[in-house]
Amino acid sequence: MIMNGRWSFNTLAIIFILLSTAALSAHFRVCEPYSDHKGRYHFGFHCPRLSDNKTYIFCCHHNNTAFKYCCNETEFQSVMQLNLTANSDSFAHNNYTALIGVWIYGFFVMVLLALDFLYYSAMNYELCRVYLEKWGLGGRWLKQARSQWHSTVQEGELNTGPGLSQQQQLHLHHHHHHHHPRHSLRGDTQSPTLLSFQTSTAW
């Protein structure tokens, strides 16, 4: 259990680092839409473009008289007069809402993955049990769950068995009562004819 806890903590730490770096780097890699000094609107784009070098991953912009373009890290720091290492912390503080959104999105993704895993394990219980026992994870809790499952199944069978027999007995008893008056009626209807036949033979 300790190894599983450490593994999950390391996984969450790696996911946090990757999401943070992706959010920080994506801020400088997007050239947002803008209007130049003549009032013409220009669409935004993501760096690097297909025609650019793969190292041009940052968006450079001198002023409104020049177009935005993709540049490398050294040109970006000289043109924009920014230090990426110094401004990463300030950017994280200024855009904490974006980081919160990323964290919420990641949380829901993890919840969906956990629910998907639980659904799959419930649908394929025997297969998961075999793999858990093979990996050494089928400990006391798995045996207890299996024994509880079998006990509930047996109790359900015992509870449904006598109930069905009682229903069948009631059905048969009710069916017998429906057929019994017919025999008595037939006996009653046949008895006058027999009496008349006996009296006619006696005369």
Curated annotation (Swiss-Prot):
Keywords: Glycoprotein, Membrane, Signal, Transmembrane, Transmembrane helix. The keyword Signal applies. This is Protein shisa-like-1a. Residues 157-191 are annotated as: Disordered. Residues 26-97 are extracellular. It comes from the Eukaryota. It is found in: Membrane. Belongs to the shisa family. Residues 1-25 form the signal peptide. Residues 171-184 have a biased composition (Basic residues). The chain crosses the membrane at residues 98-118. Residues 161-170 have a biased composition (Low complexity). It is a single-pass type I membrane protein. InterPro entries: Shisa, Shisa_N.
